């Protein structure tokens, strides 16, 4: 438990630093570049994330939960598969660039996407000792690597933006960040390096575990990027850029929670399965109450201050991001409540149930976004994201009960408190939010 708390705190400090640097970069770049540049980069990011998730074999979770997760042969095989995947992703990006530029009616995508996709090729060479450090909850060096990488990317982005005043600044700085991350991982994280080899048994284990992760991440792409994929098609680039800034500010607590839980819950579940004893379940309940409470306070604080934050931090071109922050943060309350349950399945190696939950989320999110946007434009799409997460709660219960992790007391307490507080924040900012209704 002590290691888990220490790892959680280090992860939170690292993530706060990382997001703080991102915010600083965002603030500087919005004053150098134009809203359309952020809209274009958001589109590029959607496609890169899509390619990454469409080919995810779950190497990180596999290393964290496998009994062979510390064996050199297993780690080298995982690294080798990761390299092959990175090369395939870059090739796919090159092939898709021109067709996507036609679909989204943005000719520049044909040039930006292949160059940006070099980041996928580079990250394929990241050593597995990064995941080994996460497996053993040694978050100190991991945090240093993440912060150092972000600092390099920030400096590169600002310098290039000042020099070029174009989207190329964001594209090239992404490549610089990937190279820096690779170097920092090799230099700063202790442990042996990897060599290229494909052990048959390790390959079979990784593929067996990863086949459901692969399907889950297809769904995960829709869950995490579906709003941008749909809104990127129907909104103008400048409007889409403003939405993306609102999303960045609103999603800080959710992204923080997801990172902490991914790095801490899987090891804790592996060492103390909740269905093994009442003591283990109560220990997990305590962790869950603390985590959800902290994240919900952060989320609703962001919602309460969203309009003011945008007014203070950004120039008038981005003011509509304020009500986006408020609405989106309020709609993320259901996600915060159930955030720990899906990782419980991965901790048990049950990637099949994890896929079923991911598929349910993807279907609910897609249908809700399409219906919401059709009925209420951007406002409807924002509300839809909260509705989708409430709709799939029965599937969450099914998964959590199978792992002995479902805690109805926790869910009831935070759903009641979250609903009352989010409704109050919504009512307080209704005059601003109403401007989103089309």
Predicted regions and their residues:
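Alpha-helical transmembrane segments of polytopic membrane transporters and translocases
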Residues: 25-28, 36-55, 119, 179, ...
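N-terminal membrane topogenesis motif
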Residues: 1-23, 72-80, 109, 140-144, ...
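Helix-loop junctions and terminal segments of transmembrane helices
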Residues: 54-71, 134-135, 246, 250-288, ...
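Transmembrane helical elements of multi-pass membrane transporters/channels
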Residues: 7-22, 149, 153, 170-181, ...
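Interhelical loop/hinge segments that connect adjacent transmembrane helices in multipass membrane
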Residues: 4, 140, 167-168, 183-224, ...
């Amino acid at each position: 438990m002590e290691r888990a708390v220490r790892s959680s705190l280090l992860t939170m400090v690292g993530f706060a630093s990382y997001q703080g640097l991102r915010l600083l970069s965002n603030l500087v770049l919005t004053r150098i570049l134009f809203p359309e540049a952020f809209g274009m980069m958001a589109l590029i990011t959607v496609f890169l994330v899509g390619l990454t998730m469409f080919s995810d074999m779950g190497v990180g979770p596999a290393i964290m939960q496998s009994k062979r997760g510390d064996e050199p042969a297993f780690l080298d095989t995982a690294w080798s598969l990761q390299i092959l995947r990175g090369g395939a992703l870059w090739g796919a990006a090159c092939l898709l660039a021109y067709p996507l530029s036609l679909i989204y009616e943005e000719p520049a995508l044909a040039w930006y996407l292949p160059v940006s996709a070099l980041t996928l090729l580079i990250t394929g060479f990241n050593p597995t000792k990064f995941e080994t450090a996460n497996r053993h909850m040694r978050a100190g060096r991991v945090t240093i690597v993440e912060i150092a990488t972000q600092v390099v990317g920030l400096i590169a982005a600002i310098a290039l933006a000042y020099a070029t005043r174009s989207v190329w600044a964001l594209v090239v700085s992404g490549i610089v960040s990937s190279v820096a991350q690779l170097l920092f991982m090799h230099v700063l994280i202790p442990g042996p390096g990897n060599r290229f080899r494909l052990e048959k048994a390790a390959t079979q284990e990784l593929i067996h575990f990863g086949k459901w992760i692969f399907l889950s991440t297809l769904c995960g792409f829709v869950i995490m990027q579906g709003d941008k994929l749909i809104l990127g098609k129907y909104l103008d680039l400048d409007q889409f850029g403003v939405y993306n800034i609102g999303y960045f500010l609103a999603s800080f607590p959710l992204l923080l929670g997801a990172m902490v839980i991914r790095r801490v819950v899987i090891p804790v579940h592996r060492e103390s399965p909740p269905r093994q004893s009442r003591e283990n379940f109560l220990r997990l309940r305590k962790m869950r109450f603390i985590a959800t409470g902290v994240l919900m306070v952060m989320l609703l604080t962001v919602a309460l201050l969203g309009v003011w934050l945008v007014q203070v931090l950004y120039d008038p071109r981005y003011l509509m991001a304020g009500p986006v922050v408020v609405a989106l943060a309020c709609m993320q309350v259901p996600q915060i409540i159930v955030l720990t349950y899906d990782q419980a399945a991965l901790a048990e190696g049950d990637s099949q149930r994890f896929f079923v939950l991911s598929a349910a989320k993807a279907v609910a999110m897609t249908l809700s976004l399409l219906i919401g946007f059709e009925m209420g434009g951007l406002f409807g799409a924002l509300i839809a994201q909260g509705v989708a997460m409430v709709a799939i709660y029965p599937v969450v219960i099914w998964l959590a009960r199978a792992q002995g992790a479902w805690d109805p007391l926790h869910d009831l307490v935070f759903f009641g408190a979250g609903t009352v507080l989010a409704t109050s924040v919504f009512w307080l900012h209704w005059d601003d939010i109403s401007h989103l209704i089309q």
